[in-house]
Swiss-Prot record:
GO terms of molecular function: proton transmembrane transporter activity
Family membership: Belongs to the CemA family.
Listed GO CC annotations: plasma membrane
Family annotation (Pfam families): CemA
Repeat among keywords: no
NCBIfam families assigned: PRK02507.1-1 (NF002703)
Name by which UniProt lists this protein: Proton extrusion protein PxcA
Keyword Lipid metabolism: no
UniProt topology in membrane: Multi-pass membrane protein
Position of the signal peptide: none
Basic and acidic residues bias (residue ranges): 191-203
Compartment list: Cell inner membrane
Source organism of the structure: Trichormus variabilis (strain ATCC 29413 / PCC 7937)
Alphabetical list of InterPro entries matching this protein: CemA
């Protein structure tokens, strides 16, 4: 029997492990090559359609549909290049002299340092052109290149003229923002007007003309400006891009961990578990709760058979027949709980893969996280005060309200059953007694620290509705 197992291992398992080890040793080379191919694809688009220049989405040469096609290809290639570069850096970080010796023994030849440096230099040259692209999408609407450049200039000596120009610029941005979104969060406007400035007194900010007149003049200038329509279109396109990227990223955060859990459980964890388990020593019950449930089910089945045997008009069953039915039911219950125990063990490892995929997605999607934050800011701060107060009350009542302990108890018991752990009542009660309190404190701190400063009317509405 051991000889047969050794032959099976050498014929089937060992080649798989060897190929997996060779794949692991080739990770740096493979990652760099894929990143290099992605950079070559971007370069090909530039040479073929943009005369070797950077892909310009504001170009009037192509239609919007064509530019959307180029933008989709560029985003995909940039994502591939960045992901593979990250994989290359991590694999190089884990690589050492022993890995290189093992690679040479396995017949793997790594490229020379000169080739690696040339490829990295080419990749950096291509990607560096588009580093700011993701941040432009996440940047507040209305922020133009002119505003970025003027922040480094020295202010003029006439404070009235400075305030007039600044108010006109702010009014133009505010008007453009109000056209494509009802309300914008105050903190998105403040960094453009107050960043890197020392606080000034009222005497320093007072000009020759009242601010209302300057605001009216600025609004008239915006209405007469022929470029205002183009600004509105550009801001609307940026808002549309933010919405698409945010919704897609939210779906990825949900779908990727779920798919990883199911695929890893079916393709990786289950075959390994089924290969190494032993049927004769396999444990039926992982905890005492499973055993109690199985015995209770078998006891109810036995009592039901005896009850039906007493009230039935048919000839009564013999003790041997009753024993046979009970034995068949016991084997059925054992198979059922054996499957539940195995499934619980598989869930532990599949959840580890799922959490790893979720963390990996967060690490490689930092620009998308910035866009998502901007999207949530526009959505949340665009709500009315009553809607904000309603959402706050809904979340606080669900998670930290009077009936929330029952929900937390169901969640913790379901999680314990998912992993095959016994439901520890002491831990559950301790968790319910502490975690909702901490969560309630965080809610209150956020409301009175941030929301009270940003939207005092929403806090007042929340207090009235809560009372």
């Amino acid at each position: 029997m051991p000889t047969m197992r050794n032959s099976i291992f050498s014929e089937k398992v060992y080649p798989i492990l060897l190929s997996a080890y060779r794949w692991y040793l080739r990770t740096p080379e493979r990652s760099l090559e894929e990143a290099y191919k992605a950079a070559l694809n971007i370069k090909a688009i530039e040479d073929e359609h943009f005369n070797g220049n950077k892909i310009d989405f504001n170009s009037a040469i192509y239609s919007n549909s064509v530019m959307d096609y180029f933008e989709s290809d560029l985003a995909q290639e940039l994502k591939t290049a960045r992901m593979r570069l990250t994989e290359f850096r991590f694999s190089r970080w884990f690589s050492n002299e022993s890995h290189q010796k093992a690679a040479r023994k396995a017949g793997i030849e790594y490229p020379s340092s000169t080739v690696i440096l040339e490829k990295l230099k080419f990749i950096d040259e291509i990607i560096s052109k588009y580093i700011i692209t993701d941040y432009e999408i996440a940047a507040p609407s209305g922020a133009s290149d002119l505003q970025v450049r003027t922040t480094s200039l020295q202010p003029p000596e006439n404070p009235s003229l400075t305030d007039s120009l600044r108010n006109n610029d702010i009014n133009k941005n505010n008007l453009v923002e109000r056209i494509y979104t009802p309300t914008s969060p105050p903190q998105l406007i403040r960094p453009r007007t107050e960043q890197n400035k020392k606080p000034r007194g009222k005497a320093d900010t007072t000009g020759i003309l009242p601010r209302s007149i300057l605001s009216t003049i600025g609004r008239l200038q915006i209405e007469l400006d022929p470029n205002s329509e183009q600004d509105v279109i550009n801001n609307f396109r940026q808002a549309q891009k933010r919405s698409i990227i945010s919704i897609r990223f939210i779906l990825l955060l949900i779908i990727v961990p779920l798919l990883t859990h199911q695929l890893s459980k079916a393709l990786i964890v289950s075959p390994i578990f089924n290969h190494f388990k032993k049927a004769d020593t396999e444990q039926i019950f992982l905890n005492s709760e499973m055993e109690e449930e199985a015995l209770s089910t078998l006891h109810r089945f036995e009592e039901r058979i005896k009850f039906e045997n007493l009230i039935s008009n048919a000839p009564p069953l013999s003790a041997e027949a009753i024993e046979t039915q009970i034995k068949e039911k016991a084997e059925e219950i054992a198979a059922e709980f054996r499957g539940e125990s195995a499934n619980a063990i598989k869930n532990v490892f599949a959840d580890i893969f799922s959490v790893g995929a979720f963390i990996w997605l967060l690490l490689v999607s930092k620009p998308s996280i910035m866009v998502l934050k901007e999207f949530f800011d526009n959505v949340v701060y665009g709500l009315s005060d009553s809607a904000k107060a309603f959402i706050i009350i809904l979340f606080t009542d669900v998670f930290v309200g009077f009936h929330s302990p029952h929900g937390w108890e169901v969640i913790l018991e379901g999680l314990s059953r998912h992993w095959g752990l016994p439901a520890n009542r002491d831990f559950i009660f301790l968790f319910i007694a502490t975690f909702p309190v901490i969560l309630d404190t965080i809610f209150k701190y956020w409301i009175f620290r941030y929301l009270n400063r940003i939207s005092p009317s929403a806090v007042a509405t929340y207090r009235n509705m809560n009372e």
